[in-house]
């Protein structure tokens, strides 16, 4: 999905517009509140968390290229600043691992038959031997992975040594979740909301993780909220970036006009490529970024 992604309602002060790309990056210039509201809105709207009449009455509106999106149109995943693997790797209907295992389970009908055969032969039949004396008989009501999952416990190992999930390296934890999301096959488009604060990963881990996101071809759209200057070493497309300030999200969808104004400002001494590099390199440094746009149209960015 690509185009103008529009959001309104909930706790937003006004309608915002995002130039949605394969990877879209939000960075805050003195507005660290709006990006979190955007993620909360999308997470709640598409995952129906606390989705009630109260939420609807707040005038929530989500559209792509002026076409309204309904809650069932997308599958939204959210990667928070710190990943709790213990929660993420529970086998339930809402977790990534649960959805993947259920998909694998349903794809192979012979698994059903094998499970039912041994369940009937080794457990149900023996139970019925006791129950028949009382005019009772047992039966399997439903066969699905989530019932069998109660017998499964996920453990964490590093070099064959068990470790607590909370001790797991955040880079490995985040990479694992992204890879699972990437492997999940769905009929609906997937949107990953990724919060990447500066403190969670080391510099080299951060860059490697961004490459993992960039190479996740089976995730249709990824929105990253970060203020780390290391981001622009991996993503060099100007249209990827959005500045969040004063309750607004400002992108570069009108970049031809922006470029024209800046070429005039620099008296044609800088090429289009040089100006683009200048903007991308300064985008995480608010003061430097403002200096580039001094003395031109204040409303442009």
Give, region by region, the residue ranges found by the protein language model.
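Glycine-rich P-loop/Walker A and Walker A-like loops and their local beta1-loop-alpha1 context
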Residues: 2-76, 80, 84, 88-98, ...
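Conserved catalytic network of the ASCE P-loop NTPase/AAA+ motor domain
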Residues: 18, 183-186, 214-218
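Structural alpha-beta junctions
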Residues: 44-52, 212-224
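Conserved Walker B catalytic segment
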Residues: 198-219
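The catalytic "switch" region of P-loop NTPases
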Residues: 215-222, 226-278
